[in-house]
A protein has these predicted regions:
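Acidic, metal-coordinating helix/loop segments flanking the phosphotransfer/catalytic sites
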Residues: 33-52
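Acidic catalytic/metal-coordinating carboxylates
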Residues: 36, 63-66
Length: 126
């Protein structure tokens, strides 16, 4: 069994999603990319136990905060990174530290996302 941590990436922007997947996989993480919260995720039938979820705030069906709350119902230990081009100008995110572990403004650098992920979930040495 591969000890690499699993990361869920949900972003409806294909370029951002693919860039995140590429960056995280090269860093040694296993990644499940999603465009939106799928029916299986909504029902709590997650294909993996995720250590971290990187969620865009603006999604087609629900906002990232609602996705984070649903995810935490089924995987309470999953750490949440909320990304948005509107940070820090989203007043609805104020006081959400119980749900969201880190906030990261778009655009972000490769080093910035890797630093945040490593703080929440380091890749084990091979």
């Amino acid at each position: 069994m591969d000890p690499s941590p699993w990361i869920l990436v949900i972003d409806d922007d294909r370029w951002t999603r693919e860039a995140l997947v590429s960056i995280l996989r090269r860093a040694g993480y296993q990644v499940t990319p999603q465009e939106r919260l799928g029916q299986e995720l909504d029902a709590g039938q997650f294909p993996q136990r995720y250590q971290v979820a990187v969620l865009d705030y603006h999604l087609p069906d629900l906002n990232g905060l609602e996705v984070a709350r649903r995810l935490k119902q089924f995987q309470p230990d999953c750490r949440i990174v909320m990304i948005s081009s509107e940070l820090p100008n989203l007043p609805e995110l104020a006081g959400q530290e119980a749900v969201v572990d880190r906030f990261l403004a778009k655009p972000f650098s490769k080093d910035a996302i890797l630093e945040v992920i490593a703080q929440l979930c380091p890749v084990p040495a091979k």
